[in-house]
Amino acid sequence: MAYNKSLKSLVFILLASQIVFVLFLCYGKSSRELGVKWNSDIRSWMTSYVGFNGETAAISEEQLIWAEKIPDYNEEIVVRLHLEEENNLSDILQKAQSQNLDIWDYNFDHVDLRLKEENFDFWKSQYRSDILINNLTETLFESIVPDTTNSPFSTEAFLQAVENGHLNHEMFTSFTDIFFKSYQNLESINSWLRLMASLYKDLSELVPVGITAEGRTILGLKLNGRHPSDNGEKIRNKKVIIIQGGSHAREWIGIPSVCYAAWQLLAKYDSDGHVRKLLDKFEWIFIPVLNVDGYEYTWSNDRLWSKNRQPLNNSECFGINLDANWAFGFNGNIDPCSNEYGGLSPFQANETMALFNLITESLSQEQKKVVGFLDVHSYSQSVLWPYAYTCDLFPPDTENFEELAIGLVKELHRVNSRYYTYQQACIPYDGFHKHYLPGTAIDWVYFAADVAWPFNIRLRDMGDYGYLLPAKQIVPTAKEFFAMILYYGEFIAEYAF
């Protein structure tokens, strides 16, 4: 009980660090010099959470439920099994699936598995292995603690500025930095998207992409540069780049990275010629959280949930793997309870159908063509291009993919000296046997939608934390990703037309 109490206390701290910014998001006006509605009722509500008298304040029922779910991972570990023989990968995957284990990552070199510590002997007796995470609960807890070091303003200073109507763009920028120093829940992310659309309404537009099985709206942010010669008229025939994150709910790091890239493009449009060129050249659509139901579930119930939350016919299990539900190399014969389950038919998931409609209907009606597509994931630090379904298919653009990928990994490395790999997304067992990744987004958009430059981007890390990357790594990762985005856009702009 003492351990559980300490967990709840840290959740209190996390909520306190976020709540001021959430209020700001909800009440920001649509101007660069912000004025914020404020009254005693709001301040009273704020105080009931933060506790200005120094005592721990009340916390939402959702946060309490989430805190009590953390001990569910007690005595669980994450291990890496090294592949030393040609049939190791298929053997390990079959055994893991038969035991209903959570497969975190796999490639031609290793397989990462989440399992009970008591079951580790079975695996290490058969394969050379290492323990990556020896205390899953502790590592999970580290991932949610916000990084509030070097905050330029105190909470009281921020509140005073809001109350006096003196909240300017500089202070907003500083608190946006704080927004990126901890993981945010879905409500905060959606409020942040609305704020961006309000602050930069001459450059951006909020886009409802679709509705999920649980009735939530998938929100995107559309970015365009200013074109004085067009007199504000809608630009037609513009090339589009789509960047999506959060298709797998537990891969949290991709979400703030996508948000950060969108913010930087908006904030630097007037001061950076390279950014201005990219917004003038392309229409950018950022979708930070495609799997909104699943992401919400990782905050309320199970931090390591991956699929969406769509009910399945004739199954007690929930959810579809959104990156296995596309109509290229689709496989509907996977166990519905598996994280790999891609549904009974392509586009069965509301989320993939929504993105399909965006690409094939909404944009085509505006005579716009998608030329770039980035599907942002974690972990493994890799840049991958089609085809994922099979290594027997070589895209005719392989040399171009490789040229661009080399530039992308150089940019990712340049920022913080992090090494990323690059390759075709299929995973070979060896020189003869192949592994198939069915129904992936990058395969469909490349083959069926004729998108020239689709990539699957897997951000930090290499397995030390896996899906539980600490909050202190959000900003460094996001900066790497933004540098990569700039190179990606410049490459397409200069060499693809």
UniProtKB/Swiss-Prot annotation:
Q: Where does Zn(2+) bind?
A: 248, 251, 377
Q: Please give the biological process terms from Gene Ontology that the record holds.
A: proteolysis
Give the cofactor binding note: Binds 1 zinc ion per subunit.
Q: Where is the signal peptide?
A: 1-28
> What SUPFAM superfamilies has UniProt attached to this entry?
Zn-dependent exopeptidases (SSF53187)
| One GO term describing the cellular component | endoplasmic reticulum
- Mostly located where? endoplasmic reticulum
| Annotated Peptidase M14 domain residues | 182-492
* Keywords, comma-separated and alphabetical: Disulfide bond, Endoplasmic reticulum, Metal-binding, Secreted, Signal, Zinc
Its localization reads: Endoplasmic reticulum; Secreted
Instruction: Write one Pfam family the protein is assigned to.
Output: Peptidase_M14
Propeptide residues, chain positions: 29-148
Has keyword Cell wall biogenesis/degradation? Answer: no
| Superkingdom in the source lineage | Eukaryota
Residues annotated as binding substrate are 248-251, 323-324, 378-379
GO MF annotation, one: zinc ion binding
Asked if S-adenosyl-L-methionine is a keyword of the record, the answer is: no
- What cofactor does this one take? Zn(2+)
Disulfide cysteine pairs (residue numbers): 317-337
Recorded family membership:
Belongs to the peptidase M14 family.
What does this protein do, in the record's words?
A: Inactive carboxypeptidase that may play a role in cell wall organization and biogenesis.
Report what the protein is called.
Inactive metallocarboxypeptidase ecm14
Q: Could you tell me which species this protein originates from?
A: Schizosaccharomyces pombe (strain 972 / ATCC 24843) (Fission yeast)
